[in-house]
C-alpha cells in the first residue's frame, strides 16, 4: 500500500517539475506538493498512519526509490535554475540532498499541524520562499 501511494506522489511531483514555470517557483511548489500529499495519504489511510509511525525502518526501505527519484528531481530543477541564473549553487548534488532531507524531516510536524500553527498555505508560502531563496542564493528581482 505504501509503495502505491508513493508512486502517486512521485507522479504528482513529476507533473510539478514539468510545469513551464520559473525554477524558483517549482521548488516551492515541489515542497508544498510533497508535504500536502504525504499528509493527505496519512490522514486518508488510518492503518497506513499507524504503520508509518510504528515501523519506520520498513517504510524507509519502501521509500528508498521514491527518495532517490525526488532528489534527482531537485537536481534537475536546481540545474535548470542555475543555468537560467536563478540560483547561485556551488554543489547541486549536496543542495538537492539537503532539500530532500529537510522536507522529509518536516513531514511529521506538518502532518500533525505543528508547522506554522494557525497559518494558511497562502500565509506561509512567502516565508518559506524567503528561506529557500536565501539558501539558494536567489537574487530578488
Predicted features along the sequence, with ranges:
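Hydrophobic alpha-helical connector segments
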Residues: 4, 11-40, 95-99, 125
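Hydrophobic/aromatic-rich alpha-helical bundle segments in the mid-to-C-terminal region
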Residues: 46-53, 60, 82-129, 139-141
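Hydrophobic recognition helices of helix-based DNA-binding modules
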Residues: 5, 9, 13, 38, ...
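Residue-level signal for short amphipathic helical patches enriched in basic/charged
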Residues: 4, 69, 90
Amino acid at each position: 500500500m505504501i509503495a502505491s501511494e508513493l508512486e502517486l506522489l512521485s507522479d504528482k511531483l513529476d507533473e510539478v517539475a514539468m510545469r513551464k514555470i520559473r525554477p524558483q517557483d517549482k521548488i516551492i511548489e515541489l515542497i508544498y506538493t510533497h508535504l500536502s500529499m504525504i499528509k493527505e495519504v496519512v490522514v486518508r489511510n488510518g492503518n497506513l498512519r499507524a504503520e508509518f509511525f510504528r515501523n519506520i525502518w520498513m517504510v524507509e526501505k519502501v521509500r528508498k526509490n521514491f527518495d532517490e527519484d525526488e532528489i534527482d528531481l531537485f537536481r534537475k530543477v536546481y540545474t535548470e535554475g542555475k543555468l537560467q541564473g536563478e540560483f547561485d549553487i556551488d554543489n547541486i548534488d549536496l543542495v538537492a540532498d539537503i532539500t530532500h532531507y529537510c522536507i522529509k524531516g518536516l513531514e511529521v510536524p506538518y502532518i500533525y499541524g505543528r508547522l506554522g500553527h494557525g497559518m494558511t498555505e497562502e500565509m506561509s508560502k512567502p516565508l518559506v520562499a524567503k528561506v529557500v531563496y536565501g539558501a539558494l542564493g536567489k537574487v530578488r528581482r
